[in-house]
A protein has these predicted regions:
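Inter-lobe coupling/hinge segments of SF2-like helicase ATPases
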Residues: 1-173, 177, 187, 215, ...
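Short, flexible, solvent-exposed loop/turn segments with mixed acidic/basic and small polar residues
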Residues: 42, 158-164, 194-207
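Short secondary-structure junctions
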Residues: 51-53, 186-203
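Short, charged/polar "capping" segments at the starts of alpha-helices
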Residues: 136-139, 179-181, 222-225
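Residues at beta-strand starts and edge strands
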Residues: 166-168, 208-213, 242
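Short amphipathic alpha-helices in soluble, non-transmembrane regions
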Residues: 182-190, 224-237
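Conserved short beta-strand edge segments in small beta-sheet-based binding/regulatory domains
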Residues: 191-197, 231-254
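Short, intrinsically disordered low-complexity segments
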Residues: 198-231
């Protein structure tokens, strides 16, 4: 959604017309996250006369390294937070649900890392407020400052689900026949196989004849999995067959 309220599909670039919610029949749309520039503009209107500093790689002036101790509002993208002289008097962490619930394997840990990096910039007596319906497990880890406990729980869950870093996982993308050939070899070698399934759409279109699959191995067999896939891919290249892309331990599985 742009500043004029026009909504465009991120996949096919088509403008969305009169949209209706199938549940409530409503027509209003709201951004899940408005971005640092828009947030800075809205805060400037809400607090006239108060300086607003926006820091981010996409800003015209780029990332602001530090600010002095005079009263001001600072809006920053994750990783671009300026250091404030004496620390910030308050820190608001916005869009907690958007950041901690992304469909990536490491979304929760990345959210905790970014929130922590911002929280440590606060003054000793300052409040840190997390907004936006964050994942409760990640939020509690931040509240209790229990990063080690969070990491232990994550590792236990990953081990139960046979996911990295407790297991090695290879994601295969390519033509159906090529992916199925690699899966057959993986199964013959005793590795776990998931799929194949249709690949995710690109610009609203699913590539015909494409497939995606996962091959999993315990850490003790991780090198064997990588070696097997490397040999098979070199064989396919030598025979000039359609390439299959292999990514080890991807953050996005499907």
């Amino acid at each position: 959604m742009d500043r004029q309220g026009r909504t465009t599909c991120r996949w096919c670039a088509r403008t969305v017309g009169q949209w209706t919610c199938p549940e409530c029949g409503g027509h209003a749309l709201r951004m899940a996250a408005v971005g640092s520039t828009r947030t800075g503009e809205e805060l400037g209107r809400a607090f006239p006369g108060i300086p607003v500093v926006v820091s981010g790689a996409r800003e015209a002036h780029g990332v602001v390294d530090e600010v002095d101790g005079s009263p001001r509002l600072v809006v920053s993208t994750p990783g671009a937070e300026p250091v404030a002289e004496g620390g910030y008097r308050a820190v608001l962490l916005l869009d907690g649900g958007v950041l901690s619930s992304r469909p990536d394997l490491g979304a929760a840990g990345e959210a905790l890392r970014q929130w922590t990096n911002a929280a440590v910039l606060a003054a000793p007596s300052a409040r840190v407020i997390l907004l936006g319906r964050p994942d409760p497990v990640v939020a509690q880890a931040l509240v209790r400052w229990d990063h080690a406990g969070f990491a232990r729980r994550e590792l236990i869950e990953r081990a139960e689900l046979h996911l990295p870093p407790a297991w090695r996982v290879a994601r295969l993308d390519g033509p159906v026949r090529g992916v199925e050939s690699l899966l057959a070899q993986a199964e013959a070698d005793g590795f776990e196989v998931l799929g194949p399934v249709a690949p995710p759409p690109v610009h609203g279109q699913v590539a015909p004849g494409g497939a995606r699959a996962l091959v999993r191995a315990p850490l003790t067999r991780g090198r064997a999995l990588a070696n097997m896939l490397g040999v098979r891919l070199r064989d396919r290249s030598a025979r000039r067959e359609e390439p299959v892309r292999v990514e080890m331990d991807p953050t996005r599985l499907w």
